[in-house]
Curated annotation (Swiss-Prot):
GO cellular component: cytoplasm; ribonucleoprotein complex; ribosome
Name of the featured protein: Small ribosomal subunit protein bS6
Pfam families given in the database record: Ribosomal_S6
Gene: rpsF
Function field: Binds together with bS18 to 16S ribosomal RNA.
Coiled coil: none
Claim: Phosphoprotein is one of the keywords in the record: no
Keywords, comma-separated and alphabetical: Ribonucleoprotein, Ribosomal protein, RNA-binding, rRNA-binding
CDD domains hit by this protein: bS6
Length: 96
């Protein structure tokens, strides 16, 4: 199992109270495959550095998880399909 950090930018038209239920739906993929979700940090609505899909704001969510590489690939694939998700970035945090 490896540690991953996933940054997700959600469409700003989604209400912020719906973000938790939206994330729960996707993070279930990790827990179903015997991985763990270590932390979910909702940063809220922030201005983007440049427009994405003609929008200048997005709701940022950072997820720290421990799981297998195939599981994180499936999560990234599912997030890419959803129109509410504007952008994702999967990273392996550096160990110091």
């Amino acid at each position: 199992m490896r540690k991953y950090e996933v940054m997700i930018i959600i469409d700003p038209t989604v209400e912020e109270r719906q973000v938790d239920s939206l994330m729960e739906k996707y993070l279930k993929v990790i827990t179903d495959e015997k991985g763990t979700v270590d932390n979910v940090d909702v940063w809220g609505k922030r201005r983007l550095a440049y427009d994405i899909q003609k929008k200048s704001e997005g709701i940022y969510v950072v997820v720290n998880a421990t799981c297998e590489p195939a599981t994180i690939q499936e999560l990234d694939r599912l997030l890419a399909i959803d129109e509410k998700i504007m952008r994702t970035k999967v990273m392996r945090p550096e160990i110091h």
